[in-house]
Amino acid sequence: MSQDDTPRVLSIQSHVVHGYVGNKSAVFPLQVLGFEVDSINTVQFSTHTAYKHIKGYVLNNDQMKELVEGLVLNEVDYYTHFLTGYSRSPDSLREIAKIIKQLREKNPNLIYVCDPVMGDNGKMYVPEEILPVYRDVLVPLADILTPNQFEAELITGIPMKDLDGALRVIQRLHDMGVKTVVLSSTDLGDEENMIGLASTGGSCYKIPIPKVEATFTGTGDLFAALFLAWSHLTGNDVKLALEKTIATLQSIVVDTYQTARASHLTGKIPPRFTELRLVQNKTVIEDPKIKLKAVKIN
């Protein structure tokens, strides 16, 4: 049992030496918001994969099992939350499913937040064999699921061309056993805004997310971590958690874009200038100012 009431998270996802994706995007905000975070890195790369040269290595299953075994043997395997993101192999996802069940033996009330990282904008960047493992093994174990539009469509097999399609996708995910479904970003035809959606207990909320004309990496990882945090801190008030998450994310993205554009007035901005400015926005993470309100749609 934990020695105090501090929430404790085990986060299993990617790691980069430079920049902010995976655990580098998730751990700092969670710590700033008062969570103890232990992290296991499914990959360790020098940078994220939008850079020209990729160096690093992948954690294999035996190594992951050994790390978890050490936590168990030393009796430091009590967690309130479990967060997963990018993983490159179906076997590693199956191992993660075993870890979830193991952690729930220690804490039956463990909250599992699953970010089913598979791709974006119609393109997969993990092996196709990962999809059925997410769909059939991990998603049914999740308390909170935070896919983007493409990932939600892959998992359910339902296209999402409008709000009705999005609601069908959400209901299908609920039917698969997920208590809280959060679509981190959907493009439903609005030229100016993406739409964020959150649904739990028969209530669904939507919130506009103004588009920023640049490509950022690590925003989904940050979204999942923030939603985990604010769900806990608001007593599972999904509307407020969504508003706080979007307020934080949008402030960081806009600040990152404006800073990058100041040194690149025209053309595409190189990846090293669009790394999320998390440290510079520590106060935003601690106390986000809500400017965009979520609206109940059913």
From Swiss-Prot:
Na(+) binds at residues 115, 146. It catalyses: pyridoxal + ATP = pyridoxal 5'-phosphate + ADP + H(+); pyridoxamine + ATP = pyridoxamine 5'-phosphate + ADP + H(+); pyridoxine + ATP = pyridoxine 5'-phosphate + ADP + H(+). It is found in: Cytoplasm, Cytosol. Signal peptide: none annotated. Pyridoxal binds at residues 14, 47. Induction: Expression is up-regulated by exogenous molting hormone (beta-ecdysterone) and down-regulated by exogenous juvenile hormone (JH) III in the silk gland and fat body of the fifth instar larva. Disruption phenotype: RNAi-mediated knockdown of this protein causes significant decrease in transcription levels of pyridoxal 5'-phosphate (PLP)-dependent enzymes phosphoserine aminotransferase (PSAT) and aspartate aminotransferase (glutamic-oxaloacetic transaminase) in silk gland, fat body and midgut of the fifth instar larva. Its main location: cytoplasm. GO terms for cellular component: cytosol. It is an enzyme of class 2 (transferase). CDD domains: pyridoxal_pyridoxamine_kinase. Mg(2+) binds at residue 120. It comes from the Eukaryota. Optimum temperature is 50 degrees Celsius. Stable below 40 degrees Celsius. Homodimer. NCBIfam families: pyridox_kin. Belongs to the pyridoxine kinase family. This is Pyridoxal kinase. It comes from Bombyx mori.
